[in-house]
Amino acid sequence: MIFSTLEHILTHISFSIISIVITIFLISLSVDEIVGLYDSSEKGMTATFFCITGLLVTRWIYSGHFPLSDLYESLIFLSWSFSVIHMVPYFKKHKNYLSTITAPSTIFTQGFATSGLLTEMHQSEIVVPALQSQWLMMHVSMMILGYAALLCGSLLSVALLVITLRKAIRVFSKKNNFLNESFSFVEIQYMNERSNVLLTTSFCSSRNYYRAQLIQQLDQWSYRIISLGFLFLTIGILSGAVWANEAWGSYWNWDPKETWAFITWTLFAIYLHTRTNKNWESFNCAIVASIGFLIIWICYFGVNLLGIGLHSYGSFNLH
């Protein structure tokens, strides 16, 4: 009873803190002058990390097994994984763009886990015999960590696509006006008008330079995180195959979860391969990673809606 109450308290505290962090972070985006807001949001994410960690440990002690046996517990672990990814660069004193991805992802997964859809899973139950194995921690934790890293990397690629497309649309729509008005020095009659045009052109060039730097950094961070997530995913699939052979006598059974895990692995293997091809631009690679964002959610969450296959123990009903 004590552990159940503590788990309930930690769940709501972590959700409340991350909600405040999101609010602070949105304010800091619009008000750059307030330096303390960024530090406050980072401290809030640290507090969220410890709350979710305490929640997982409490549920582990209360249930007697590692908390990864159903969708609710895996969502909590996914939320914890997002907070870990957020904090690693922070402790290394590297300010990056991950916070724009990890903080909303944490509140989304934490909010859904505590929603009414998964109320039946909030109470810990005895795990099915197939899950009573030491491979549970190895396999599922690696898969969830892989999903978290791949989702973050994919969202960075989506951001790269949005910035690039906005730039292309802006250049296309203003190309004629820019050429006619900014560079038609014949029509400029006074020196001060020419000076204004040069200042405007210089400002545009400076803005384009910083946009190019932003795109490059997003591309680099996306590649690094996806590479890490791909490693976790590979370890998770291999450990799952060994576990399946022990439990069911076969390394691979092509049930829906395994099939979509293989599709996910293949897609990001293609992404990493395209990164080695110098003829492929970052925009094209980002398209592949963006498709991977949808594939991951189908693999992790969409397949659970079917409620069939060897992984049906992680499914839930919408009624």
From Swiss-Prot:
Say if the entry is tagged with keyword Chaperone. no
Q: Which GO terms describe its cellular component?
A: chloroplast thylakoid membrane; plasma membrane
In terms of PANTHER family, this protein maps to:
CYTOCHROME B_B6 PROTEIN-RELATED, HEME EXPORTER PROTEIN C
This chain's protein is named Cytochrome c biogenesis protein CcsA
Would you identify the family this protein belongs to, as annotated?
Belongs to the CcmF/CycK/Ccl1/NrfE/CcsA family.
Main localization of the protein described in the UniProt heading:
plastid
Query: So where does this one cross the membrane?
Result: 9-29, 48-68, 71-91, 98-118, 143-163, 225-245, 258-275, 286-306
Arranged from A to Z, the UniProt key words for this protein are:
Chloroplast, Cytochrome c-type biogenesis, Membrane, Plastid, Thylakoid, Transmembrane, Transmembrane helix
Q: How does it assemble?
A: May interact with Ccs1.
InterPro entries cross-referenced by the UniProt entry: Cyt_c_assembly, Cyt_c_biogenesis_CcsA, Cyt_c_biogenesis_CcsA/CcmC
Q: In what way does this protein cross or attach to the membrane? A: Multi-pass membrane protein
Tell me where in or outside the cell this protein is found: Plastid, Chloroplast thylakoid membrane
Q: Which Pfam families match?
A: Cytochrom_C_asm
Q: Care to name a GO molecular-function term for this sequence? A: heme binding
Q: Which GO terms describe its biological process?
A: cytochrome complex assembly
Function of the protein: Required during biogenesis of c-type cytochromes (cytochrome c6 and cytochrome f) at the step of heme attachment.
